[in-house]
């Protein structure tokens, strides 16, 4: 059975480690390659309070595209993988909108002018409407996503099209990690997307789930 809490990772640790019955906490990290390492950098002060288990639930497969992207178009990255996919297309575009602080940092270091950034697609749409760009926009996204930002932009009078830049291939939880998760120890599992939640339900169960992305709780 799942117990979901919309909270920060710090609140999750406080709730579980303050309870004398909740010992030997497991932090289960399920992001694709590179994602778990980036996440740990943001919570280094908490890592000594738990055992970290690394078991990605997705393998990212980058896809080729025959779609021509005009150099003056504004790119939209709603994930780091969208940005990584664009690098494989050797695009010369200089401006972008992004979702996520890490995505913003990487885009900036790659030479992009980040016109606006937000924590989720819903708020990014609001920011784009405020910026009111006249250029065409290109959303480089994964095959499986929540919501449709491009359609929302077109419905608001903007020019936008999509490129499916990568596929998220499902992976099962590693067998040895699955046994630890099922051992009865308290588990904190950060969830960043509805897709990740559905994959988890398909593969295993955990006694405690902390939702980082508020959109997951609305699903």
What are these regions (language model features)?
Residues 13-219:
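Signature of uroporphyrinogen-III synthase
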């Amino acid at each position: 059975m799942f117990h979901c809490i919309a909270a920060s990772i710090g609140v999750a640790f406080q709730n579980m480690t303050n309870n004398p019955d909740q010992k030997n906490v497991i932090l289960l990290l399920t992001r694709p390659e590179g994602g778990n390492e980036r996440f740990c950098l943001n919570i280094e002060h908490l890592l000594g309070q738990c055992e970290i288990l690394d078991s990605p639930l997705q393998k990212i497969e980058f896809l080729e595209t025959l779609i021509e992207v005009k150099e003056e178009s504004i790119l939209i990255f709603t994930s780091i993988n969208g940005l990584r996919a664009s690098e494989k297309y050797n695009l010369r575009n200089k401006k972008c909108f992004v979702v996520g602080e890490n995505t913003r940092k990487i885009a900036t270091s790659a030479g992009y002018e980040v016109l606006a950034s937000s924590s989720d697609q819903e708020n990014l749409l609001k920011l784009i409407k405020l910026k009111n760009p006249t250029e065409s926009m290109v959303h480089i996204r994964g095959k499986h996503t929540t919501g449709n930002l491009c359609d929302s932009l077109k419905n608001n009078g903007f020019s936008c099209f999509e490129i499916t830049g990568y596929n998220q291939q499902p992976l099962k939880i590693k067998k040895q990690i699955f046994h630890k998760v099922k051992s009865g120890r308290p588990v904190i599992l950060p969830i960043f997307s509805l897709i990740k939640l559905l994959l988890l339900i398909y593969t295993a169960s955990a006694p405690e789930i902390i939702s980082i992305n508020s959109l997951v709780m609305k699903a």
